[in-house]
Amino acid sequence: MKKKVISALLCMTMVATMVAGCGDKKSSSDSDAPKKGSAKDFDWQNYKGTTINVMFNEHNYSKAVIKKIPEFEKKTGIKVKYSSTPESNYFDKLNTSLSSHSGDTDVYMTGAYQVWEYAPAGYMEPLDDYINNPALTDKDYNYDDFIPGVVGALKWDLTAGHKVGKGSQWALPMGWELNNISYNKKVLKEKGIAVPKTTDDLLKAAKALKGFNGSGTYGIAVRGTREWATIHPGYMSLFATWGAQDFAIEDGKLVCKLDSKEAIDMTDYWVKLIKEGGSTQWANATWYECGKDLGAKKAAMMFDASSNAYFNNYEGASAESGNIAWSTVPLPEGKTDADAKTNLWIWSLAMNKDSKNKEAAWYFIQYFTSPEYMLWSGTEGASPDTPRTSVMNSDEYKGIVGKADNYLESIAALEKNASIYFTPQPYFFECTTKWAETLQDLVTSNKYKSTEQAMKQLKKDLDKIVADIQIDE
């Protein structure tokens, strides 16, 4: 049944796209195709009086947008209604809204991985015809100013197993996150511990820092809940650096590679790191708990999004503001700096394909991914990982974000090997959730005799999940 469902969804998406190309559009709801025109037709007040609904994940990026919504409403005459939900149940709420096909949500906050499920299901409006339409896009928008690897990660051709970077532009970036080591520099200095550069160093440091500030304090914060979000930050970054991969295409099929020596060795190390240097509450740790513990001097180090630590370091953000510094990705034995890889996460704005207010929705996305807004959000809005080159190179940005100890330097060191290291496929969330369950079982139970046994069973489970995917090269 799965194969039939996927094929049908892809066909519906293709048909909808073909139909959208026929004829001009008089209003947002008449057709999927945005109206055509010239630059003289563009006016920020063109959709005055329209009301749009926006769904946000609770995050610094969305907090910055929300702060500027009154200015957007004044500039455009568009009324914005919004909700902001913690990540722990945000995507459940979003999925319910999108799957209803009611069009109640016009714009939503999402990540790059969601594209692989949402786009084939018909939940996303391709943005290319909006971006390239001078009647709908301000002449100063400058799409080419986006960092190519970041905006390209939100392009996909709807073919399972194919890498991102080709196909439609399904969303536009609010900010991107690479994953690396951050640490409390004051604590490490007081304890006489050097910043870990290798995986051996990291394990020794995490063990030595257990209980560094009393009962309940620990060496390193990493995510641990039984859901997909546990896999993509620190774990996947080290997984890729180790030389492992999740899937390969063989004879037109996706084949899971989690039983490789590299995958087993890396996972075995990760389990040991958590057991010997992690939190006793690791199984409940999300983005929020990891960052909060670093900022509260409960964790001495963290392997997570660079911005997660940044949000706890600017003035007044946490008890340890100003004491946090950044490093890169620890290197396994035999690896060099050139081998260091970091997995990308990209918070983005997307348009619901069922929206009845698509032009107004595009105005919202355009405004909150514009150079002007992103210069503000990257400096005064505490959204440090800007996706725009002009902002990243600006004196204002460097002057503010550059105050964070080794923040920009660590990003520069990892940027060339920052990528999405997962294989795009529509069962991504089912697979990574199963992966996280296995990881949690290895840490918290005696279900498996060894990491090797667990990973070999996981390989079998994931092969079954993706068995119906056929890839035509």
Go through each PLM region and give its residues:
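Short, low-complexity disordered leader/linker segments with a strong preference
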Residues: 1-52, 74-75, 460-473
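C-terminal capping/gating helix-and-loop segments adjacent to ligand/active sites or protein-protein/ligand interfaces
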Residues: 340-342, 404-461
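Extracytoplasmic/periplasmic solute-binding protein
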Residues: 157-174, 179, 203-255, 271, ...
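Extracytoplasmic/periplasmic substrate-recognition and gating elements
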Residues: 74-75, 79, 99-100, 167, ...
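Glycine-centered hinge/linker elements that transmit conformational signals in sensory
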Residues: 206-208, 249-283, 325
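Extracytoplasmic "Venus flytrap"/periplasmic binding protein-like
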Residues: 70-153, 186-197, 291-293, 297-301, ...
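Short, solvent-exposed loop/beta-turn-alpha elements that line the ligand-binding surface or hinge
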Residues: 44-46, 128-149, 224-225, 242-265, ...
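Hinge/lid segment of periplasmic solute-binding proteins
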Residues: 33-46, 115-178, 325
